[in-house]
Amino acid sequence: MKNYCGIITLFLAIISATGVFCVDFPNKGGKCDRKECRKTCKKLNYRGKCFPNYCRCFPG
């Protein structure tokens, strides 16, 4: 089962106080690319961390 967290979680992150959300990488066969993850999160001034099949962005 695919882990869909993209847009919905992004909106939840904006609303929520924690601001932690994750990003899907459908083009990489579900694998998280560390470089892409960090680049994506950096655009929003977040830190990116890879998990097996998604990228999670943390504030700071």
UniProtKB/Swiss-Prot annotation:
It is found in: Secreted. One of its GO terms (cellular component) is extracellular region. Its main location: secreted. The record marks 58 as: Aromatic residue of the functional dyad. Coiled coil: none annotated. Keywords: Amidation, Disulfide bond, Ion channel impairing toxin, Neurotoxin, Potassium channel impairing toxin, Secreted, Signal, Toxin, Voltage-gated potassium channel impairing toxin. Belongs to the short scorpion toxin superfamily. Potassium channel inhibitor family. This is Potassium channel toxin MeuTXKalpha3. The modification Proline amide is found at residue 59. Transmembrane segments: none annotated. The keyword Disulfide bond applies. Expressed by the venom gland. May block voltage-gated potassium channels (Kv). The record marks 49 as: Basic residue of the functional dyad. GO terms for molecular function: potassium channel regulator activity; toxin activity.
